[in-house]
Design a protein with these regions (language model features):
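Short beta-strand->loop
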Residues: 31-35, 128-138, 146, 150, ...
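Bacterial signal peptide processing site
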Residues: 6-9
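Short beta-strand-to-loop elements that line the ligand-binding cleft
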Residues: 56-65, 82, 154-165
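Pocket-lining segment of extracytoplasmic ligand-binding domains
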Residues: 86-87, 156, 161, 167-210
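Short, polar/charged alpha-helical segment
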Residues: 24, 28, 34-68, 72-74, ...
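Flexible hinge/capping segments at coil-to-helix
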Residues: 17-23, 114-130
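A bilobed periplasmic-binding-protein/Venus flytrap-type ligand-binding module shared by bacterial periplasmic
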Residues: 44-46, 110-121, 210
């Protein structure tokens, strides 16, 4: 995931030209992020903001999909957004550079889970249903790459079922008795494992990628 940063009319070079001795003027900044690990990385900022420990005043918009705030980011109604890297790249091009990538805030949070103990490598995914999220974004591209590099056709050898939220994919895995698997990010991995003792981490996507 990348953090894409946009600017509005108040974020102009005038502020940068002020003398360093001048008093800092607090600004109102709206931050948008996706549910799950993307937003969890902002918990301290959220807490500090509530306790009036931040230099600026922040408001937060947490959504299930980046589409819910991309238009506002381009318009400048949202100043900071955490979203998939491909979405950030698209916005950079659409906005002619007005929206730019400033950092990566999540790494190594994807795992493949099963509830039968039958999956020990990527090849074991062949013929299975895979529940996941992020159609058209980083999770889908990552999954397709891993399958292809292990000789599995993502469109023929497996059935990838995309859900709008990770919690839905977790529920489908927990209720499945057909050997289905799910690719989920933390903290949903921990949540589903705590709720169902049969569910385990079968593959660490980061290690498989490496």
């Amino acid at each position: 995931m990348f953090t894409a940063c946009g600017s509005n009319s108040s974020d102009k070079s005038d502020n940068a030209t002020q003398e360093s001795t001048s008093e800092y003027v607090s600004e109102d900044i709206k931050v948008a992020a996706l549910k799950g690990p993307t937003a969890i990385g902002m918990v301290k900022l959220m807490s500090d903001n509530e306790d009036n420990k931040t230099a600026n005043n922040y408001t937060f918009q947490i959504e299930a999909a980046a589409d819910a705030f991309t238009a506002d980011l381009i318009k400048g109604d949202v100043q900071i957004a955490a979203m998939p890297c491909n979405a950030a790249a698209t916005l950079y091009n659409k906005s002619n550079g007005k929206v730019s990538v400033v950092g990566i805030n999540t790494l190594g949070v994807l795992y493949i889970l099963d509830n039968k103990g039958e999956v020990t490598n990527v090849s074991d995914l062949k013929g299975r249903t895979i529940y996941t999220t992020g159609k058209g974004t980083t999770p889908e591209y990552t999954l397709r790459y891993l399958l292809n590099t292990n000789g599995i056709d993502p469109d023929k050898d497996v059935h990838i079922e995309f859900k709008s939220e990770a919690s839905e994919a977790a529920t489908m895995l927990a209720s499945s008795d057909s050997g289905a698997v799910a690719m989920l990010p933390q903290p949903y991995v921990t949540t589903v494992m705590a709720a169902n003792s049969d569910v385990r981490i079968a593959l660490d996507v980061t290690k498989e990628w490496e």
